[in-house]
Structure formats: structure tokens, C-alpha cells
Curated annotation (Swiss-Prot):
<dbReference type="InterPro" id="IPR036574">
    <property type="entry name" value="Scorpion_toxin-like_sf"/>
</dbReference>
<dbReference type="GO" id="GO:0005576">
    <property type="term" value="C:extracellular region"/>
</dbReference>
<dbReference type="GO" id="GO:0042742">
    <property type="term" value="P:defense response to bacterium"/>
</dbReference>
<comment type="similarity">
    <text>Belongs to the invertebrate defensin family. Type 2 subfamily.</text>
</comment>
<protein>
    <recommendedName>
        <fullName>4 kDa defensin</fullName>
    </recommendedName>
</protein>
<feature type="disulfide bond">
    <location>
        <begin position="15"/>
        <end position="35"/>
    </location>
</feature>
<keyword id="KW-0929">Antimicrobial</keyword>
<comment type="function">
    <text>Dual-function peptide with antimicrobial and potassium channel-blocking activities. Shows inhibitory activity against Gram-positive bacteria such as M.luteus, S.aureus, B.subtilis, and M.luteus as well as methicillin-resistant S.aureus (MIC=0.1-20 uM). Does not act on bacteria by disrupting membranes. Also moderately inhibits Kv1.1/KCNA1, Kv1.2/KCNA2, and Kv1.3/KCNA3 potassium channels. Inhibits potassium channels by interacting with the pore region. Does not show hemolytic activity.</text>
</comment>
<keyword id="KW-0211">Defensin</keyword>
<dbReference type="Pfam" id="PF01097">
    <property type="entry name" value="Defensin_2"/>
</dbReference>
<feature type="disulfide bond">
    <location>
        <begin position="4"/>
        <end position="25"/>
    </location>
</feature>
<keyword id="KW-0964">Secreted</keyword>
<feature type="disulfide bond">
    <location>
        <begin position="11"/>
        <end position="33"/>
    </location>
</feature>
<keyword id="KW-0044">Antibiotic</keyword>
<keyword id="KW-1015">Disulfide bond</keyword>
<dbReference type="InterPro" id="IPR001542">
    <property type="entry name" value="Defensin_invertebrate/fungal"/>
</dbReference>
Length: 38
């Protein structure tokens, strides 16, 4: 979700939008958008 696995930038922007410092695609086949815990 949120751009993963193909568009990690979309995931990063989603995380920024919820006041995290960013995010990345993680999990099985990188299909999960994971936000950094800051």
C-alpha cells in the first residue's frame, strides 16, 4: 500500500503527511509501507 512496492517515494510522502520523518517499503516483497518511528 501507499506506493509500495514500486513507488517508495509515495510511501515516504504518506509517512511525512502523518508527521513521521519518512518511511520505506518493507515486508514480504516490499509490499508494506513502513513509517519510521520518530
Amino acid at each position: 500500500g501507499f506506493g509500495c512496492p514500486l513507488n517508495q517515494g509515495a510511501c515516504h510522502r504518506h509517512c511525512r503527511s502523518i508527521r513521521r520523518r519518512g518511511g520505506y517499503c518493507a515486508g514480504f516483497f516490499k509490499q508494506t509501507c513502513t513509517c519510521y518511528r520518530n
